[in-house]
Amino acid sequence: MATVNQLVRKPRVRKVAKSNVPALEACPQKRGVCTRVYTTTPKKPNSALRKVCRVRLTNGFEVTSYIGGEGHNLQEHSVILIRGGRVKDLPGVRYHTVRGALDCSGVKDRKQARSKYGVKKPKA
């Protein structure tokens, strides 16, 4: 325990919280242009071809974003919206693509959890 005199001379230093999503710069989402759309394999013990894209954001950052859902229409030069949220089994992927916004279509034939995949309510 520090004495009062020691604390007067050198006060306690606050810990600075580090952001998990630095490229968003405290915004909820950011717009960007796809520079590369590709698949990659997850860490052990999982096995799949995960759809991801490299995105150049409006603030100059270049990040990797995960494309959730079954099937997508993204290609190079597509304009997309990204949000925060990492993919645990893909190292370096800290962002998700927002489905149903800008050039990214919603998931086709999706009936449940539609809001997460940009799908409108089906007609009765």
Curated annotation (Swiss-Prot):
GO terms for cellular component: small ribosomal subunit. The keyword Ribosomal protein applies. This is Small ribosomal subunit protein uS12. HAMAP family: Ribosomal_uS12_B. GO terms for molecular function: rRNA binding; structural constituent of ribosome; tRNA binding. Keywords: Methylation, Ribonucleoprotein, Ribosomal protein, RNA-binding, rRNA-binding, tRNA-binding. Coiled coil: none annotated. The lineage of its organism: Bacteria, Pseudomonadati, Pseudomonadota, Gammaproteobacteria, Enterobacterales. Belongs to the universal ribosomal protein uS12 family. NCBIfam families: rpsL_bact.
